[in-house]
């Protein structure tokens, strides 16, 4: 009887041990699969986050450059209103959304969002026909554009109060009214350096000019237009400088930055790659819209 009792106790102990082993195995199997699931889920999140970061930190940005919009004439810097409308249709059909320079700058500096396929439309010089033909089309297609004005042109037509789409330029009252329109943004195209008559091409430094003289000249000109914007447009200050003729000197960019401009526009063709580095906003490439070719012929080179 004594031996049987010991044997009975051993059987119970073995039974308990087996139950414990089974329980440990079940829980171990469960926790192993849970750990594997969590690791896999985390890896997937890392992959998605990496892709998202790459997408948000590197943006492909085409910029189109227009000047005058006219029905009566054609030329290298003149586009017919019908051509402009066809361009707008083509841009939208390709899935692109227009943005302003301020929205682009905000993306780089403040991590704001941009549409999936952004594009910037620019008009140089501030021709009055931009108001006559371009602005109604911007409204029609719910698009935005950047107009860079030459201050002396605007002052001249403000004084004469002449409004002629064939040869005139926007007056300050036109600009002030358009400032309240979300489809148009205004930028600085110099006060009086859009000329070849003085021996200086745009704002390029003369070979005989000292750095100090050049700095004072460019600072004075650009500041004059900045101040006129403040006076005529409720304190508004342009954040982007647009080079006349795309004429650039190696010294000019630092002066532009020192004056507080967050971006600059060149006339060099190509498509921009935008990152979170503020330096990518300077000397942005633009593509001049020439007359005589279809929207598809022009945009096939710069749109995906």
Regions found by a protein language model. Name each.
Residues 136-142, 168-188, 257, 274-277:
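Acidic (Asp/Glu)-rich catalytic clusters
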Residues 142-165:
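A short, conserved beta-to-alpha structural element at the edge of catalytic cores
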Residues 125-136:
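Active-site-adjacent structural elements in enzyme catalytic domains
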